[in-house]
Regions:
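Phosphate/pyrophosphate-binding loops at sites that engage ATP/ADP/AMP, CoA/4′-phosphopantetheine
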Residues: 1
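Acidic/hydrophobic-patterned starts of short beta strands in beta-sheet-rich repeat architectures
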Residues: 5-6, 37
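Beta/alpha (TIM)-barrel catalytic core signal, keyed to glycine-rich beta->alpha loops juxtaposed to Asp/Glu
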Residues: 11-185
């Protein structure tokens, strides 16, 4: 019995990287964990862990969706004086690509930390119009298109979808076969 992937959820200001490394090493040596990752860590926090763990961090799970993508917004607004140009995550997406760390998107249908789901939300009429149009074109649901949007990014982002609804899970799984064009993205 083992865990495929064990994540450290959220950074800890009092974390001692050497202690984490020792725990990682023990769990891996005992065959209890196959791989390690983090959630919501910036590049320097990952560097601290990787220095102590000899590069054990294989995954960084971040909040990411078509309606919540500040890591992309910051890159598109370089040298522009607006809020979207503020780099709040240390270029985590680019960093993970450079270091071959898999990015996983949690809450792929959410538009903020606690605000809710953007699909069908009155706050996102234009986005929902596009999602519905593309869903019809690709014979799927808006959820499927939202996941296809994430999968289209060249970083190879994986989505974490929590659902008890088999139909939703089936629709989301079909997103792997949808390749949005640049214009659709």
């Amino acid at each position: 019995e083992y865990v495929d992937l064990l994540l450290l959820h959220r950074p800890d200001a009092l974390m001692e990287p050497e202690e984490v490394a020792e725990a990682f090493d023990t769990l891996k040596t005992q065959g209890k964990v196959r791989a390690f990752g983090v959630s919501n860590h910036n590049p320097m926090q990952i560097e601290l862990l990787n220095q102590a763990t000899k590069g054990a961090v294989e995954v960084n799970q971040i909040q990411f969706s078509v309606a919540h993508c500040p890591t992309i917004d910051a890159g598109l607004n370089v040298n522009i004086q607006n809020d979207a140009g503020c780099n709040r995550d240390g270029s985590v997406l680019e960093y993970c690509r450079l270091k071959n760390i898999t990015v996983q998107a949690w809450s792929p249908f959410q538009y903020g930390m606690f605000e809710g789901i953007f699909i069908g939300s009155e706050k996102y009429p234009k986005l929902n119009e596009v999602l519905n149009r593309l869903a019809e074109k690709y014979n799927t649901t808006p959820n499927g298109i939202a996941v296809a949007w994430i999968l289209r990014h060249p970083a190879g982002i994986q989505t974490i979808v929590g659902t008890m609804n088999e139909k939703r899970l089936s629709d989301v799984a079909k997103a792997a076969d949808i390749v949005l064009t640049r214009e659709e993205w």
